[in-house]
Amino acid sequence: PIALFLMAALTELFVGKRRGAGLEPAVRVLIYGGAGGAVIAAIFGWIHTGLWFGGDTAMQLHRWNGMLIAVLGVVLAALAHRRPESRTMLRIALASMAVLILAQGFLGGELAHGQNHLGISWL
């Protein structure tokens, strides 16, 4: 889902720059795929850890951020499905998704490689 949502955001930038290029269906398909993948990833995340709510802060943030990504993915799919005159809400949601995905990647790195895995002490 990560790559699909980020590619949807990038493609939406091209839609904004080149009106009439016919890229809107591509954005829609990328969002649908990302939403489906995000829901599946969230389900498997819960299967992996069960209803165990322990773990450190990074683990809990990763879990709940993943849930937020799945929910926002479904909202994005609904926004992409309807054809509004303005794409402002879709663009805001895609930008929000990009921020959430960047945070999720960082948290995943924390879980896999430990604290300060990027070697940047101020994070």
Q: What is the predicted role of each segment?
A:
Residues 1-123:
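Polytopic transmembrane helical bundles with strong interfacial aromatic enrichment
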